[in-house]
Structure formats: C-alpha cells, structure tokens
C-alpha cells in the first residue's frame, strides 16, 4: 500500500510539474537556436543597430533598455525566437 501511495505521489509531481520553469531562447543574432531554463516568468528579444548591423539578443526576464533599443517580452516557452 505504501508503495502504491509513493508511486501516486511521484506521478502527480511529474505530471503537475510543481517546479515549473520557463524555457527561453538565448542565441545571439543569427546564431543557431539554443535555449536555457529560466527562473523568471518571461523571455525577451532585444534588437538594435550598430556598426556591425542589426544585433539581436535573447534571454530570460524582461530588462529595461536604453533609448533606440527595441525589446519584445513574452510569457510562453521559446516565444522569443
């Protein structure tokens, strides 16, 4: 009986994902797609232009940006690709 109860608890934790974390893309500019697991509840994509052309930065959270930098924050997994 104890084994059955323990099995039910483990299955519940796995399926409910009690420690849910966000997955955000974190590749820079035109690099191949990579992701990271984040503790924050949002992802961002920052874009700006400099002497190299258009630069794109992706990551976790929703940072403040300087004037001239575009930012898009979102709240679903890999939404910042």
Swiss-Prot record:
Disulfide bonds join 24-43, 38-60, 62-73, 74-79. Its main location: secreted. GO terms for cellular component: extracellular region. The keyword Aminoacyl-tRNA synthetase does not apply. It comes from the Eukaryota. It is found in: Secreted. Pfam families: Toxin_cobra-type. One of its GO terms (molecular function) is toxin activity. Expressed by the venom gland. Belongs to the three-finger toxin family. Short-chain subfamily. Type I alpha-neurotoxin sub-subfamily. This is Short neurotoxin 1.
